[in-house]
Amino acid sequence: MRSYARHQGSQASIATILADISTNDTGNISDETVGAYLTALRKIFVIEDMPAWNPNLRSKTAVRTSDTRYYVDPSLGVAALGLGPNDLVNDLNTFGLFFETMCIRDLRVYADALDGSVYHYRDKNGLECDAVVLCVMVHMV
């Protein structure tokens, strides 16, 4: 959970998470185990990865399609890293990542109420958008 917290808001692969665990945590773990843990965390609604948005299936622009990793609630990532308010105030980059997670969480709640979805966008040139909200609003009389 600590490694996932360090990579939330990114498109980190299982290999990246595995390397982070090997570097920063004790013990060795296989990629199958990491995958199983992530699946279990998804099933109990602790994490919810955000899919990539592709504006045009026939576009010549290479769009990155990896999911962005997020905790359902940013406080879970903060707790996993053992951080407190002073830690976040003194590390504004980390604070910004958790703030982004909070914004994504709220956008997902609002979009879901409108039968919508939230995606991210990033192309090969580095152009990115943290949140693309798609909602279909149909009013029937």
What feature does the model see in each segment?
Residues 1-139:
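Accessory nucleic acid-recognition modules appended to NTPase machines
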